[in-house]
Amino acid sequence: MAPVILVGIENTQRRRDMTGPTTVKKDRKIAPVVGGAAEFRRFIATELVPWVEANHPASERRGIIGESAAGLFIVESFFEMPGLFETSIALDPSLWWNAGKLAKDAGTWFMAHPETRGRLFVAWAEPETIGPNVRILEDALKQAAPSQLEWKVVARPDLSHGTIYRALAPVVLPMMYPPE
């Protein structure tokens, strides 16, 4: 694996920081505060990334990996702030959030952003809640992904929502960051 700088980001309210806005009443009941992803993304882009780059020999091959709600944040960040991360790895992303709006709008977004580049890797294990919206995203990628975007969607029914990160992170990171 290529040398990387790994930054773990602790947050104080996971569901607030990892979720975007929602119009679904049931979504708003899962935590006292939701919908703070834009502010968390702003922190990463305007404070954390500049600090890391000023204090460490970082490259532009910036990436992000996460699962579940963090996977949702990663996919949303891919669409909301393209280019913030060159590599986005979302494992069992909670794309059911806001009635699956991110996945459902993906095809239209790709058509409007043909210059999008980078790498997007999505893997899913949970078939009933996660799978349907990941398949919608995959269909959008098949139909409309820009040619400069490298992408892969992988179904892993042998894993579970609780095991996918530990099983795949050690495999996917070296795959996305091979030795130079």
Where do the model's predicted regions map?
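Non-catalytic cap/lid and distal C-terminal segments of serine-dependent acyl enzymes
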Residues: 1-180
